[in-house]
Design a protein with these regions (language model features):
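Intrinsically disordered, low-complexity proline/glycine-rich segments
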Residues: 1-100
Length: 100
């Protein structure tokens, strides 16, 4: 069984501030929204840096993606995939489209 496929506007696990998937493949959609794949970034948000208050603004890409399901040569993003470096993970995706 696979994990829910993520898409533009879906949430990532928050740290200093919330963020969502910002980039997707415009001509490949899940639930009528562009899918987000390996290498696609989230919205600008705050990231904690030890010893440097306050949090800094950054974006981060999906580092991992499906090894089996590819979109334009990139692994499709799924809930639980790592976003980084040193960032978070994909938190939300399609309720009815899964990828292994």
């Amino acid at each position: 069984m696979g994990s829910p496929v993520t898409f533009v506007g879906a949430a990532d696990v928050p740290h200093c501030s919330p963020m969502t998937r910002a980039v997707g493949v415009p001509n490949v959609r899940v639930n009528s929204v562009a899918v987000s794949c390996q290498g696609h970034v989230n919205t600008p948000h705050l990231r904690p840096v030890p010893g440097i208050p306050p949090c800094i603004i950054h974006t981060a890409a999906i580092l991992t993606g499906s090894l089996r399901v590819r979109v334009t040569g990139l692994g499709i993003g799924r809930v639980g995939d790592i976003v980084g470096p040193l960032c978070t993970a994909v938190a939300a995706g399609s309720p009815n489209v899964l990828a292994g």
